[in-house]
Amino acid sequence: MKERLPHEKGFHVSWDQIHRDSRALAWRLDGQGPDNGSWRAVVGITRGGLVPAMIVSRELDIRTVDTISVKSYNWQEQQAPTVIKAPQAELMGDGHGILIVDDLVDSGKTLELVRTLYPRAHFATVYAKPSGRPMVDTYITEVSQDTWIFFPWDMALQYVEPYRGRD
């Protein structure tokens, strides 16, 4: 079987689609929190999880929002994930009642790292690939492992390299 380049099996996500799918994620999570169905806070994994986290927090009326910044890609190559910025320690504890949101779970390495830090948090992604699916508690759409997802914040009419560099 011929190997495909990432863009040859691409899944292009529009702003409307990420908005709809993020709202669907919020609806699936509604009433599922450990505190009488509520969540204490939403933590978005930056950068890709920022848009879905904002939409989920709005839909569920969760005002406490923080971020964790994990770098696991250098340009288009996956590398060992590292935490660049952690959320407030007082907020997080062991993660109980915290909803951690990302756009995609791919290999699962990012979520695996974050899960070791906050083992009782609930992990939710909009999209999931088979290799990473065991690391996520809730997701909306599964895509094949060899599909490259093109998010609207990464594209113009064609892929555009970030102005300041490659990562």
Swiss-Prot record:
Residues noted as binding xanthine in the record, renumbered to the chain: D106, I149
Q: Give the EC class as a word.
A: transferase
Q: Where does GMP bind?
A: Q79, D106, S107, G108, K109, T110, W148, I149
What the entry lists under CDD domains is as follows: PRTases_typeI
Q: Which residue stretches, if any, does this entry annotate as coiled coil?
A: none
Sorted UniProt keywords: Cell inner membrane, Cell membrane, Glycosyltransferase, Magnesium, Membrane, Metal-binding, Purine salvage, Transferase
The cofactor named in the record is: Mg(2+)
Q: What is this protein called?
A: Xanthine-guanine phosphoribosyltransferase
